[in-house]
Amino acid sequence: RAYPGLVNVPRHWVRCNPQGTQIAFLMRDDNGIVQLWLISPQGGEPRQLTHNKTDIQSAFNWHPSGEWLGFVLDNRIACAHAQSGEVEYLTENHANPPSADAVVFSPDGQWLAWMEGGQLWITETDR
């Protein structure tokens, strides 16, 4: 089924969680703001996960546990809880905004990496 409002900027891929039970994607909400949405691989209606006041600015990735999704929001690295949609920031604002390329979790989920100002950055996730 086609959904109006699907976005391809920032660069975007549909991503399935590690358990294979949810597919995440970026789509505009009723206010035109780019949000994370989830849908079952079996189909059904998509569920809006995030309710941010500003656009998600990057591609995203699933935490290895499937409990979090990482992305750039408000020029900061953020994670959204995969059930509640609650967003937590992992970084403060930097001089250069993070790249719109996907943030990447380490295999154990304890670290998150991203590009910013032509350099590789990492932070602990506490997850």
What do these predicted ranges mean?
Residues 1, 44-48, 85-89, 122:
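Predominantly a core beta-strand signature of beta-propeller blades
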Residues 37-39, 78, 121-123:
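Conserved hydrophobic/aromatic positions in well-ordered beta-strands
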